[in-house]
Amino acid sequence: LVTAGQTFQALLIADDASGGFFALNGGELGKDLGGIYYFAPDTLEWESLDTHYSGFMHWALCGDLDLFYKNVRWTGWREEMALMNCNLVYSFYPFLWTEQQLSVEKRSRVTIPVEKHWALCLDLQHQLTNMQSDDLLPP
């Protein structure tokens, strides 16, 4: 987690329209320096993609994106995203990390600036992490 005065030891290299972020690990996310991680909007956790930058680029250009994004595609998504500004991402309600069994078709969505979404994700992740650690404290 990043807090005021700390440096995030990873380099954000991409984001996606569903609100996920891709990062090159600089030590923040695991021991695999140079590994690529995905901040998943459905878990609010960094997940290793078990690849490095060149593998990520190959996947982004030639990989099975339909499989990767199958849970965040809705009827008409392609046409809707074609009109979208590249500085925006979708924010879903209920959030994707809540009610995970709920289809994306049944969620409302709006576009928001990617930097606001990044800040929101970090804040939510921080709050959830603090709640979990508070649960571990003795009464």
Task: Name each model feature, range by range.
Residues 1-139:
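A C-terminal-region feature
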